[in-house]
A protein has these predicted regions:
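C-terminal partner/receptor-binding element of secreted or periplasmic proteins
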Residues: 131-151
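C-type cytochrome heme c attachment motif
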Residues: 33-45, 62-66, 100-104, 121-124, ...
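A general structural signal marking secondary-structure boundaries and capping sites
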Residues: 46, 71, 106-110, 144-147
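Sec-dependent signal peptide recognition
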Residues: 2-10
Length: 155
């Protein structure tokens, strides 16, 4: 539970930066480095033409192209767990706050978001540092275009 409190504190600070007009509050450069260290084993970022922009063509996790402010669990041809699909169907999108909390405790975040103690996330990796997660979100926000309708589209 303390991870949620820490994540909430960091994202509260981040939210004030976003409210001031910033798309995200982290360092894009630091996020790129952390993505290379922590995410590439499972994820890629490939554009709509299939060009890999980041990652090693991993197939364990979904493509993270256009992640920022997109619906959870909606990348075509990826087999998500039921809980993350359900979260997306309730209108959840990848905001900085949601991303930071999720990557620190995927199952815990889904259980809280869905108010369902049986919900489980498929992502086994947990990011330890909230600032790393904020930076990675900032980096991912630069890769891809926002969906035409907020809250819809690919994850």
């Amino acid at each position: 539970m303390s991870k949620f409190i820490n994540a909430a504190a960091v994202t509260l600070l981040a939210t004030s930066a976003i409210a001031d007009g910033h798309a995200s509050s982290g360092s894009v450069d630091a996020g790129e480095q952390q993505f290379k260290r922590q995410c590439v084993a499972c994820h890629i970022v490939a554009n709509t033409q299939g060009e890999v922009l980041a990652g090693r063509n991993a197939r364990v996790g979904p493509n993270l192209y256009g992640l920022a402010n997109r619906q959870l669990g909606a990348v075509e041809n990826y087999r998500y767990g039921d809980a993350i699909v359900e979260a997306g169907e309730t209108g959840q999108v990848w905001t900085e706050e949601a991303f930071v909390a999720y990557v620190q405790d995927p199952t815990g975040w889904l259980r809280e978001a869905l108010d369902n103690n049986r919900a489980r996330g498929k992502m086994a990796y947990r990011m330890r540092d909230a600032q790393d997660a904020i930076d990675i979100y900032s980096y991912l926000a630069t890769l891809g275009v926002a969906s035409e309708t907020a809250g819809t589209g690919l994850n």
